[in-house]
């Protein structure tokens, strides 16, 4: 009797472990997060290059040129292992030159990279101009450094502390914990700006009634251009295809193209109030997505609860709020505020911009609806079937990736 009971308990334990291993909340490859360099898989070509560098470093230096080559190979090897070094040196050089110059006005050529430009005299408002592109470009480098530094120096040791031994799972946690950090800052920052504006709780009429918003407060412009830099940096990594593409790679590329078009058009044509609301909907929902995936990697009992919160915020922010904005384009765009095309006064809220705004937001909504279908399918299986298998995750599961990792170590 005891033996039979023990066998039954063992079977339950095995089944529970199997079910947990099949859990794929952590493998939901949707949302806007793009992997960083620190989380990229090591290819055969990169391994061969590393071997060549190590061979060159261990060789004898017969000439001065050999010593220079060793210095160069040493730097390349360090940069290969710590990909944040190059952007760090660029940032240090630019910041040092700017602050040591003693000139922190817009007459300094470096000002357009380090600080926002076009301050309206005697006010906290800032206009827009071509120099804003320099700011976005420089902070693309900043976000590259921040992402890789946090992953390599802060998050990776933390995953070791949490006893995450699988390299594959560790890399996935690097991506998601960075997303938690970024969205955990940008989401509340955006909500703070919204709270101190006339848009609180996603009001739509002020988006059109006060148009055009030609100047923005300091924090608003910092937030908007910072988000532009973040998304542009993400897009660059995505286009380079430094990681094996996800199954929804085309949808992800399409999502980034639409997002960048929305950022550019909303900024240039003064629809930044609408852009602020859309930024917030993406950041807050992505925070809960990354949090649920991270908890899943840690086999936390809170995973289902947080995943439920994620589903709620995703539906409310990415669908209810976004569809309300779409509806406002059809019902309020013409009637609230000026509705005229006038290049002299920068009035672009007219019959030309209405369909463009609607199509771009609708395109974003279509991608989100596709991802919602996948989310609800996982939620259904979680509730009714007790599994969380995601059929649209990478072709290799966590388990197969970890098996390959073990084979490589054995070889």
UniProtKB/Swiss-Prot annotation:
InterPro entries: Lag1/Lac1-like, TLC-dom. It is found in: Endoplasmic reticulum membrane. Disruption phenotype: Deletion of LAG1 results in a pronounced increase (approximately 50%) in mean and in maximum life span. Does not affect the level of total sphingolipids. Exhibits weak diffusion barriers in both cortical ER and nuclear envelope. Double knockout of LAC1 and LAG1 abolishes growth and leads to mating defects including defects in diploid cell formation, pheromone-induced shmoo formation, induction of cell cycle arrest and activation of mating-specific MAP kinase. Also defective in the localization of STE5 to the plasma membrane. Glycans are attached at residue 103. GO terms for biological process: ceramide biosynthetic process. Its EC number is 2.3.1.297. It catalyses: a very long-chain fatty acyl-CoA + a sphingoid base = an N-(very-long-chain fatty acyl)-sphingoid base + CoA + H(+); hexacosanoyl-CoA + sphinganine = N-hexacosanoylsphinganine + CoA + H(+); tetracosanoyl-CoA + sphinganine = N-tetracosanoylsphinganine + CoA + H(+); eicosanoyl-CoA + sphinganine = N-eicosanoylsphinganine + CoA + H(+). GO terms for molecular function: sphingosine N-acyltransferase activity. Keywords: Endoplasmic reticulum, Glycoprotein, Lipid biosynthesis, Lipid metabolism, Membrane, Phosphoprotein, Transferase, Transmembrane, Transmembrane helix. The chain crosses the membrane at residues 82-102, 131-155, 173-194, 218-240, 250-268, 274-295, 306-334, 354-382. Phosphorylated; phosphorylation is induced upon disruption of sphingolipid synthesis. It comes from the Eukaryota. Residues 103-130, 195-217, 269-273, 335-353 are lumenal. It is a multi-pass membrane protein. Residues 1-81, 156-172, 241-249, 296-305, 383-411 are cytoplasmic. Its main location: endoplasmic reticulum. Pathway: Lipid metabolism; sphingolipid metabolism. Residues 168-385 form the TLC domain. It is an enzyme of class 2 (transferase). GO terms for cellular component: acyl-CoA ceramide synthase complex; endoplasmic reticulum; endoplasmic reticulum membrane. The modification Phosphoserine is found at residues 23-24. Disulfide bonds: none annotated. Component of the ceramide synthase complex that catalyzes the transfer of the acyl chain from acyl-CoA to a sphingoid base, with high selectivity toward hexacosanoyl-CoA (C26:0-CoA). N-acylates sphinganine and phytosphingosine bases to form dihydroceramides and phytoceramides, respectively. Has a higher affinity for phytosphingosine (PHS) than dihydrosphingosine (DHS), and thus preferentially produces phytoceramides for the establishment of lateral diffusion barriers in the cortical endoplasmic reticulum and nuclear envelope. Component of the ceramide synthase complex composed of at least LAC1, LAG1 and LIP1. Forms a heterotetrameric complex, where one unit of the LIP1 homodimer interacts with LAC1 and the other with either LAC1 or LAG1. Belongs to the sphingosine N-acyltransferase family. This is Ceramide synthase LAG1.
